[in-house]
């Protein structure tokens, strides 16, 4: 399989629905074939997110220290069991560990079949639903205790070095959640805007907050591989099995190689996934590519650099321990002798026993979580029920961002998706189990003009097991808008909403 340039994965490409049909056509006709969905087919034959019903109980001291968390999740997997048992697990696995002071926790789940669309993987993968429930419960706890939601989180969050019993007992090796919390508080002007302000003409503005964590690949399961070689002109070719689905991972992986090899990014050519020639990669899913495949690339580049030094030392008549890799050349320690990369590459192709190529496969025994805090400022028209997010502040700890620009647009896109889940995107079924929202006229996805200012900052930690300290970012960014927007609407209307999306009709009734 030679992967073409595709975009917009978000989990949909993990599940085979109609792909078998063009395969049969090709098999029978011996000719290429493709299947192109209409919008109706895309809306009715693809895999939506799992519908979940959650029950949360919290035990806390009077000063807001959360001592116990009890979460039950009932998940609707639809007509088939695609991803059913795994997504439901993440609803607890990626929410409970945020609260590091809890002395007791329980997570119980059930998955049921229904006569609905078969649910599948979607960005956030169950954590999104669980975080909406747990974070909303914490916001409600703060309200009942008369404590600022920001303050109650300050008192309870997990910190770097803490053991996380609800996260496989893993040590929190890198964490800037405390700094993310403070940054969002300061950037949105929380103290001046919390909880609500009357803007006149029946409109109010309120703020709400939420936190999130995710994973960086699947522990001891995901595999990333890289092959790297130097060409006769001194440039590099990097072959990877990971699929760039619009995330920019080809660029990021090339950056990692270029950093190790101390060369311009343009000197690294990336060859994408081709199952006949690319090294094995288990797939671009579960926020794993930068953390898992990126580490393989880093190790691969280090191995190649050592081989280049060996050949360069031979050309200079020196011991390999007496030379220095200088990016475009190998030099003696005093700099008086020099062999260029082109000379070294040419030498390796004639009478050499050292192949200037390296292949590395990597898998991680841990999955260090990225963290995020988000705060929404929502303007609500109490008469019409219209709610608009006019400002969203976010702070993300994804370790050390390899490419801050790509990380930022990942975050902005995830926030926009989360706001859509909170306010407009809904799926309902008729008596036959057919979805009613079968076009974009009925299924409202927010456009950029529907949302106000989105501002993302990064609070860097350093994850020693990742490439140059990096963790994942792909999924965590969708998780905070749901509880943040819901809490802001509560402050505006004084009514809690426990189902999503929160529609204009519901808000208008609450405002009466």
Predicted regions: what they are:
Residues 3-19, 45, 79-84, 201-211, ...:
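FAD-binding core of FAD-dependent oxidoreductases
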Residues 9-37, 249-257:
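Thiamine diphosphate
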Residues 10-16, 44-50, 70-72, 78-85, ...:
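Short acidic, glycine/serine/threonine-rich loops at helix termini
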Residues 27-35, 62, 87-214, 256-512:
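C-terminal catalytic domains of large/alpha subunits in multi-subunit enzymes
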Residues 32, 39-105:
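Active-site cavity-forming subdomains of large catalytic enzyme subunits
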Residues 48-52, 219-220, 368-372:
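Short loop/turn motifs at secondary-structure junctions and domain boundaries
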Residues 71-80, 243-245, 392-399, 460:
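Short, solvent-exposed aromatic-acidic interface loops
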Residues 216-278, 293:
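Catalytic phosphate/nucleotide-handling subdomain of diverse soluble enzymes
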